[in-house]
Amino acid sequence: MFNKVTKTFQYGQHTVVLETGEIARQASGAVLVSVEDTVVLATVVAAKKAKPGQDFFPLTVDYIEKTYAAGRIPGGFFKREGKPSEKETLTSRLIDRPLRPLFPEGFYNEVQVVIHTLSVNPEIDPDIPAMIGASAALAISGIPFNGPIGAARVAYVEGQYLLNPTASQLKSSKMDLVVAGTENAVLMVESEAQQLSEEIMLGGVVFGHEQMQAAINAIHDLVRDAGKPEWTWSPAAKNEALIAAVTAAAQEGLSAAYQIREKQARTTKLREVYAEVSAKLAEQAAAAGQDAPDGVTVDNILFDLEARLVRSQILNGEPRIDGRDTRTVRPISVRLGVLPRAHGSALFTRGETQALVVATLGTKQDEQIIDALMGEYRDRFMLHYNMPPFATGETGRIGVPKRREIGHGRLAKRSLVPVLPKPEDFQYTIRIVSEITESNGSSSMASVCGGSLAMMDAGVPITDHVAGVAMGLILENGKFAVLTDILGDEDHLGDMDFKVAGTENGITALQMDIKIQGITKEIMQVALAQAREGRLHILGKMRESLDGSRTELSAFAPRMLTIKINPEKIRDVIGKGGATIRALTEETGTQIDISDDGTIVIASVDEGQAKEAQRRIVELTADVEVGQVYDGSVLRLLDFGAIVQVLPGRDGLLHISEIANYRIANINDVLKVGQQVRVKVIEADEKGRLRLSVKAIGGIEQQQAAADVPAQAETPAE
């Protein structure tokens, strides 16, 4: 019934098992990947033919987490998995990026890769097994695919690279780097780091690529024993006559368009060229009694011509699209405190890319609670990236963030995390929002720069400025050019684009996407060195506007006071059913967070209210000391004495014999409920019960006499 094939290989400290032939047999390819209780099922299905008129490659990758994988039932009313989480979206992108360049040019059949996480060991992140599984499923499917790829996670612990670390090991690592590639080439890098040098980062990439060969070899073995026949597919023959006609009609116009330095004017000119070429070809076809050529085909030829033109200009040492040389960063403008009521804000403009970045400070209650498959956790730092259609001068849909926005936001967040103050030094929750108001390339890196500036403007004591720069690389016939601070057009036309963020001391985030084979370690070294040069230039411009974090928080930011109490006293602050803390927050207008270790954080925009809440908490939690004198209040009277409250929640017995220096016949003759009386604590037993005395500090008669003196002084003379 089943023709099950299994391959096993050692991957770092883990054993990886690849299985096919038992589950999801109707898919084009299906592989079950197991790594020490983490199990993922990767499937791929491809349409047998492309849709008519299809002019792009419709690849979709969906990574899906099921809560049963962690032995849990989904929360919420419906008790069912809902929209993709941020983790699912980011992992889907992580898998998509190295796979997409390996499909042959001209292959437009729809391909869907779906990865389900079926079981999770909290120590083993499913993302690397998912990438290996997707690669293996494609490799055995017979679909045209120039793979397989391998994938590896690399940590850097105590000066050593570590392959596929566990979640616990990552906590002590200075690097979290994911690299994917084929036997001969690196295709994708995604990493965050604790301000490491270019050499260490590149070493991690090379180490990961060397180690992933074990996964690639295992996939080759799986294909040999379980692979399906390769498709008999070949790309459609190129219409050389049409290419020649389009080239002749467009060459002059395209060359003129790319002499225009301003984006909007250049785009307008290019649209005119496209329209003129289409009209000219239609006219020629009509004169020959033929149908006009397909518009999509003509547009694709024109795009190829644009790419060839721009690439050749750059490789020949001519100026780039906007007139710069390969190393120059576009002009930078920084304006701080743009929004009067925001806690911190910065308008960061680099050429035709602009980000309005806003920092907001909140309390512990504002932390994001993330119900992740590998365990729930709280996040005190959020960065949200938004790019509306007007940023590129277009109309479009406004709504929930798209995959691209989520990915760019995560990259910017990774860049800034290493410079954040420790939670014990700065107890605020921080939210950064980057609103991209103009875009012509490198908007995620503008968000990094703006985020760093906005936090400093808000008074967040980050350890250093962080700047980011987007780089491009063009490689042809042994010649290559590295481009600093690429434009949007250069992003599409290059062979490698990578983004580097960091401080003066080192890299905090690195993202690389390589579209071709042949980019060597030496080329990457040159590219990273040039990126550092660009980053340092940008950092210099940022320092000119603001050299360090402001010493004062915004007047509109909450003020925080921290006190430490005995953890056993927490119940006194909370009160029965939460009544005490609820009354405290309502009456003082503060937010109060209590940790299990007894740390209490009081937050309020009004510092006076925060101090009042602090005073009342100190009263609630103060320890009563034997021998100390307190101003008490009579709670109730007994035949043999009175119960007197000495502190909120603490009361004791004032025996009738300890009230006065004379014998009292009736307690009601000397005390009333609610009466204020000074008492001394003379004993506390092992259960915390208190014995009080007024007689020990002079007796009730002395207190009554002292109270009568000001009363007599106030009586008017006869």
Swiss-Prot record:
It comes from the Bacteria. SMART domains: KH (SM00322), S1 (SM00316). It is an enzyme of class 2 (transferase). It is found in: Cytoplasm. Residues 558-617 form the KH domain. Mg(2+) binds at D491, D497. Residues 627-695 form the S1 motif domain. Keywords: Cytoplasm, Magnesium, Metal-binding, Nucleotidyltransferase, RNA-binding, Transferase. InterPro entries: ExoRNase_PH_dom1, ExoRNase_PH_dom2, ExoRNase_PH_dom2_sf, KH_dom, KH_dom_type_1, KH_dom_type_1_sf, NA-bd_OB-fold, PNPase. Its cofactor is Mg(2+). It catalyses: RNA(n+1) + phosphate = RNA(n) + a ribonucleoside 5'-diphosphate. PROSITE patterns: KH_TYPE_1, S1. One of its GO terms (cellular component) is cytosol. Its EC number is 2.7.7.8. GO terms for molecular function: 3'-5'-RNA exonuclease activity; magnesium ion binding; polyribonucleotide nucleotidyltransferase activity; RNA binding. GO terms for biological process: mRNA catabolic process; RNA processing. Involved in mRNA degradation. Catalyzes the phosphorolysis of single-stranded polyribonucleotides processively in the 3'- to 5'-direction. Belongs to the polyribonucleotide nucleotidyltransferase family. This is Polyribonucleotide nucleotidyltransferase. It comes from Bordetella avium (strain 197N).
